Amino acid sequence: MAKVVDRFISYVKYSTTSKEGSETFPSTEGQLKFARLLVDELKELGLNNVHLDEYGYVMATVPSNVDHKVPTIGFIAHMDTSPDMSGTNVKPQIVENYNGKDIVLNKSKNIILSPDNFPELKKYTGKTLITTDGTTLLGADDKAGIAEIITAVEHLMNNPEYPHGEIKIAFTPDEEIGQGADKFRVDKFGADFAYTVDGGPIGELEYENFNAARAKITVNGVNVHPGTAKNKMKNSLLIANELINMLPPAEIPAHTEGYEGFFHLMSVTGSVEQTRLDFIIRDFYKNKFEERKNLMVKIADYLNVKYGENTITLNLKDQYYNMKEKIKEHIHIVYTARRAMEEVGVTPRVNPIRGGTDGARLSYMGLPTPNLFTGGHNFHGRYEYIPVFAMEKAVDVILKIIELYATK
């Protein structure tokens, strides 16, 4: 089995789930344990300036082996896995020569990965896949990216005749909870530009993403005994429901695709006395993004007039922006990635990211950073899987990008 696979199988067995609301950085101790493992591995490979900082960021350098000036390229992946599903006690399963039919992930629990539900599986008939055992996520997002970067770097270190400029690599914590770039030192990293290796199926190349905001809403009610509540009770649950129904019903994740934005209600907790709503707001276009946020403000203002001042408190905060605005100033990094894919036999699929990456924020911090595929599918859940050949191609693409810049 390829080295990239061996690495990946090893990495996913480390529990690195990030945790919302943690008071530590990184948010979980497991990420630091994994980071220390990566530091040891990078040192064994002979990289320079291998460093783990107090916030859990791993950085290292491959020195240039060419005499002429070439740009310093960075490759970045994140160590944490999504809190949407357990990442503890991951038991990857290898499915060789996939037959195009149902894959039984867990016989005792009757958990099946089926092409009826995931038709893209059919494309991998005859290929080797890595799946979960149905009880956890897999962690290809983004331990596949880490395995692919380190395998590419190992090739550079073991083949000194392979031309390359200075290469910087970084592995970040807490990307899945939106904090992956919070403590990232762009100046310390020292790259002219970078690529995150955090995308999905083979061929994905992304340099557009959502503009993103989060809206945390508190609805304050008045609770009295229901038998004597007339003209006194103010039920925060009903007001919260009214607020939800004032948003466009079709503009939710289940009804949108491509470049369409949405409002997404992530959680509701409450009682008559008080209800809390947690929304995310997403749109690719800045003007529409602002319109969505303004609608939230107007709804809150309206309900405060209707039910009384301070019935609604709205905490609206931008999270990240569409990196296209920054990438387009350095579009050669996208064109070079496209060419690299084509030269190693991968068809580029340039699509907008209906989400965000560390690269989105890093691009606004002065480090333009589009996103490359890992090869994985169905991230964040029990049906996550990754084809082995896609991982191998991801390594090839990384190496080809490096070569193209070194030989221009």
From Swiss-Prot:
Keywords: Aminopeptidase, Cytoplasm, Hydrolase, Metal-binding, Metalloprotease, Protease, Zinc. It is an enzyme of class 3 (hydrolase). It is found in: Cytoplasm. One of its GO terms (cellular component) is cytosol. Pfam families: M20_dimer, Peptidase_M20. The keyword Metal-binding applies. One of its GO terms (molecular function) is tripeptide aminopeptidase activity. GO terms for biological process: peptide catabolic process; proteolysis. Its EC number is 3.4.11.4. Zn(2+) 2 binds at residues 141, 176, 380. The keyword Metal-binding applies. CDD domains: M20_peptT. Belongs to the peptidase M20B family. This is Peptidase T. It comes from Halothermothrix orenii (strain H 168 / OCM 544 / DSM 9562). The gene is pepT.
